[in-house]
Amino acid sequence: MQERSSQSAQLTATDTGKATVGEVDAIALSLDPVDYAVISHALIAIAREMGTKLVRSSYSNIVREAQDASAALFDAQGNVVAQAELIPMHLGSMSEIFRACIEQCPSEALKPGDFYINNDPYGGGQHLQDVFIFSPIFVAGEIIAFAGTVAHHLDLGGGNPGLTPDAADVHAEGLIIPPSRYSYARDWNGGPLERLVAANVRVPVQTIGDFYAQFAANAIGTARIEELAARYGIPALLAAMSELMNYSERRFRAALRAIPDGVYRGEDAVDDDGLNDAKLVVKAAVTIEGERIGVDYAGSCPQVRRNLNCPWASTVSATLAAIKSALTSPDIPFNEGFKRPISVAAPRGTLVNPNYPAPVRARMLPAYRCFNAVLKALAQVVPDQVIAGGNDSTHALAISHLGTNGYRVYLEICGGGFGGGPRRDGCDAVDSPLSNCTNTPVEATDMDFEHFRVIGYGLLPDTGGPGKHRGGLGLFRRFLILKDGANFATYTDRVRLRPYGLFGGGAGSHTRIEIERAGSVIKLKSKDRVELKAGDILTLYSSGGGGFGPAREREKALIAEDVAQGYVSPAAAAKLYGWTEHQ
């Protein structure tokens, strides 16, 4: 197995197309501004259409409802040109994962109908459930671009349905698909690769259906690029791709020039590894020097035995997401150009750059701590562009059951409260910034699953950290188990270490998961697996976000509104803000 985790990486884009950079740039300079505007916006629209096609065509609730998927367009060398705004965690890694594929099989060897596929955490990928598929786009016999998608697959085998919190290594987490080239007509579409995948998963209808959704989304991207090439010509299309990346680079470099040079440090920690109570610290040193920014994770804790390890691609993605959210405006497209001024480094064998075969299924938890550590560092230099610590955890809940008709696997990523910010309160009960999944409607779970029912879902008062701008509220989601032998597996965080406040703001609430059984309450660990019985009531209580600024500076009208809406109880308002009912 190829080990792609590296001690450091320079995140730069390669040349675009077979023309030299100078030739493409010359065409870009001569490109009509109106044509450029139309083509560049069309590229972004195509990526979004691909994302919509993927979500609407999928079979599993984790993609169809939660939208745990992404789509992007690439130039011929695998540089991201445009990407759908679905999962930020996928933003930075898709080009790195693509390049792992072309290292195994150069794109010159591809034929129409071929595709690359990869989910190997030690071959450029993230965790096994995120499967990346890249399809070449041929025009006039030449590859001019690629369409790429990634979907989180509901089940890819492994030791437990949905997720395996006690996996000893990456092999126990599911089927590994190394960076490879296949033919759709020969190897998929009823061929040997499709049959191999179907034979290794518990819910083949949903899993194979989601693979077909990825191929369908890639086909949409291919068709739309062919239309653009036919209308504007290949040279203009390639030039617009190049200029779109250059535009993002110019805008980001300008933003960096406005920030004082220096080294800024931040750290955060995962609660524990599920085996002991030692917190898992992630440290980030952010260096800004002119038009460049570097992040070094030296000093972060060693890799662990459980699945909390964060592979290199995930660390890079979390870092890029933090930088983009704090230092750029939303109108700057994310693409390879944005990445050019950035470097990321992390020592081998650490939590954020583990060695094979460390398990990585829950890599989102340390990835969030990378995100938080970078934002804490940047808070020292751009305090008006960051938010306090939020729920910032993947509350992954997998409830499965094996019945006479096979497995039923429910997987959901539940949200919590955002941290308060410099201008407003944190958002209530939403997924965290890196993940950005939507909730699964109760009606959808009622239709899809017969081994449980959702019997409660709502906001948790008094969970947002106090501050001038309070943290967002956490949520509760309550399940009634209907059948004996249901399997519950989870990984979550913020159970021991609360979301931090910034600039005098208070911490948010803790997370907890409980089972009510026969009149008693069983408290689960943050990383756990248990067998459930009919009649059990399982409840997640997610954490609220930290507050921003001192609570004494909160406007009285906002406090009164919080009390009126039930977001903050009168007792908590009196204790935390000095509020009285007659104010």
Which residue ranges define each predicted feature?
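Glycine/proline-enriched, intrinsically flexible loops and inter-domain linkers
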Residues: 3-4, 15-112, 117-139, 143-582
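Low-complexity, intrinsically disordered or signal/transmembrane-proximal segments
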Residues: 2, 7-10
